[in-house]
Amino acid sequence: MKNPILLFLLIISYLTGHTQYDAHPVIKWAPAGLAFGKLSLGTEYNFKKKNSIELYIGIPIAATRTIDYDNKQSDIESKVFSVLAGYRRYIGKKPAAGFYAEPYFKYLEHHAQGILEGDLDSKVARMDTKTDYKAWGAGIQLGYQFLIAKRICLDFFLIGPEANIARFNSQSTDIANSIPWTLIQSAEAERQIKDAISDIPILKDKLEISVDQSKKTVYTEYRGFLPGFRLGASIGFRF
């Protein structure tokens, strides 16, 4: 995590020290990040009339959501760290407003944990689950930015296809008791984890799944290419 933060700070330092154009920097906030476990803050430097550099950092904060697992409700807490840097080109005549295209690079870490409540062969199971996702990605964002009274920015991320090199793994251990699983319980645990993963469309057919019967644990792992899509909105203030 330290290297992306350092890169983020170095870029900001470079821009503030070398910009000749009256930049009018914009400070932005993307509220949707709160639902995923991050405070997403950004800045845009309009270094030429139609050209900007945009930087975002996602600061991890805890977010809890309820998921369905084995026909029961379970809570999962997640946190996200992210860094994004993009070069934005506006199509219209006004600076920092109108339609734009923005190639970007990003780094993202997503961590989640929680207890999945269920049953294995009619016995109570409590799956202590941890997931870890890390990815480097690149994409192109198409969007539209409104500039109200030359100060308030409303930025809409309309279409943003991206490509990622990712690593994902998870570990789910039954902590209900210390008795080893039977073969039937092992098979049921694997099936239940597969069903839970099916809610993640881009991962469900790619994961390698293994079961350690004596440790009462299900492992999943994936390394490789993953497609992605960026959309959303932010609100900002232009200085």
Regions found by a protein language model. Give the residues of each.
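Outer-envelope beta-barrel architecture signal
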Residues: 21-27, 39, 47-53, 95-101, ...
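Extracellular/periplasm-exposed beta-strand and loop segments of Gram-negative cell-envelope proteins
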Residues: 29-30, 57-84, 110-135, 163-226, ...
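Transmembrane beta-strands of outer-membrane beta-barrel proteins
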Residues: 26-32, 56-58, 99-106, 157-159
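A contiguous binding-surface segment within folded domains or other stable secondary-structure elements
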Residues: 89, 94-146
